[in-house]
């Protein structure tokens, strides 16, 4: 899509409390972000959220659509583009997990949101008891420089099911 080298790496996996994200998340916790969320169901349930800092959003949308940030159609292009990119990346991450665990995971349609990261995770955590697992998947594009993160948010109990499945490997 971008005709540029794309790098996905997983430098860390962190569990955290949505009320107190901790030092590991200072680079995203108080900044404006754009996110795409897909809920998933299977042997474990929750949400996968792809988070981009606002400066990466502008670069990504411009690179993929040609729309400029000050153009009339940029907001619509942003929502549509990030939903598509989020769908692809999240399905790749979750598909790899499902393949590794020899199971099937079903997804909802992508949902696009903008705002502060702390507001996003607090609103997500307030609906049900949740365990937040950050599989910090760095999404990097060399030219233009774009980065993002994938967060996995599990319903209470589902994280135990995931860990049990991993232990069986």
Language-model segments: which ranges?
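Composition-driven recognition of glycine/serine/threonine/acidic- and proline-rich low-complexity segments
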Residues: 1-169
């Amino acid at each position: 899509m971008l005709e540029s080298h794309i790098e996905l790496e997983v430098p860390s996996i962190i569990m955290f409390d949505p009320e107190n994200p901790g030092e590991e998340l200072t680079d995203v916790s108080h900044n404006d972000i754009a996110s795409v969320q897909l809920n998933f169901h299977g042997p474990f349930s929750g949400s996968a959220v792809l988070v981009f800092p606002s400066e990466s959003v502008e670069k990504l949308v411009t690179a993929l659509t040609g729309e400029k940030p000050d153009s009339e159609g940029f907001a619509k292009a942003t929502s549509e583009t990030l939903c598509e990119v989020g769908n692809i990346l999240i399905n790749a991450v979750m598909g790899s997990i499902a393949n590794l665990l020899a199971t099937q995971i079903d997804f909802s349609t992508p949902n696009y949101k903008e705002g502060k990261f702390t507001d996003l995770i607090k609103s997500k955590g307030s609906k049900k008891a949740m365990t937040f697992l950050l599989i910090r998947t760095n999404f990097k594009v060399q030219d233009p420089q774009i980065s993002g993160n994938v967060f996995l948010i599990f319903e209470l109990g589902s994280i135990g099911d995931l860990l049990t499945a991993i232990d069986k490997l």
